Swiss-Prot record:
It comes from Homo sapiens (Human). It is found in: Late endosome membrane; Lysosome membrane; Cytoplasmic vesicle, Phagosome membrane; Cell membrane. The modification Phosphoserine is found at residue 33. The keyword Lipid metabolism applies. Residues 13-23 have a biased composition (Polar residues). It is a multi-pass membrane protein. Signal peptide: none annotated. It catalyses: a 1,2-diacyl-sn-glycero-3-phospho-(1D-myo-inositol-4,5-bisphosphate) + H2O = a 1,2-diacyl-sn-glycero-3-phospho-(1D-myo-inositol-5-phosphate) + phosphate. Keywords: Cell membrane, Cytoplasmic vesicle, Endosome, Hydrolase, Lipid metabolism, Lysosome, Membrane, Phosphoprotein, Transmembrane, Transmembrane helix. Its EC number is 3.1.3.78. This is Type 2 phosphatidylinositol 4,5-bisphosphate 4-phosphatase. It comes from the Eukaryota. It is an enzyme of class 3 (hydrolase).
Amino acid sequence: MAADGVDERSPLLSASHSGNVTPTAPPYLQESSPRAELPPPYTAIASPDASGIPVINCRVCQSLINLDGKLHQHVVKCTVCNEATPIKNPPTGKKYVRCPCNCLLICKDTSRRIGCPRPNCRRIINLGPVMLISEEQPAQPALPIQPEGTRVVCGHCGNTFLWMELRFNTLAKCPHCKKISSVGSALPRRRCCAYITIGMICIFIGVGLTVGTPDFARRFRATYVSWAIAYLLGLICLIRACYWGAIRVSYPEHSFA
């Protein structure tokens, strides 16, 4: 019932003061925590927005990503944070892994470790049950567990790659430039010396046969074959010695027990 002559249907706040009124409800803040509600992973079926265009939440910043014309893709790129978000299941035998730097990686199901390719990260992710950061679950902080292996600086391109061998003095193929180099200088030095020694021995044997058996070779033509074999083996060994002497050497950055 109206009181003091005020109509009960009149507004509680007069028009003269309505411009100074601010809403009392707290503003809506989009949840950005990794524990926020996320859409089902690897599916292109997302709730459409008001205009009927399919959208999905970014798995990094939770912004809406427009899927119009992108439903045939496996991943889409967020226009806000520029990170990738999967909308389909990975190919057969593959799996998605999210690096702590938010880079979306794809690797084999059987992979135990994977290295982040970003120059400002270069993190080695152990895909064991402790450090598994899969897109099937909300991202959890990676535990600082040292992986087995070492990071090697390529002798050709200078890039760093993960080398999983537990012993030095072996050959390694750089995944960046696809060239082969020796990890450590002991192996090429040792093999170069060995091939030089064997090559010189074969050449000395060939010279000895040439000088010591000329008369015998005139009677038995097969003797020339032994000369040729000795010289040929010596030449091959010297060529291999040149190869090992000129091979590039890659040096490890850090070694993990």
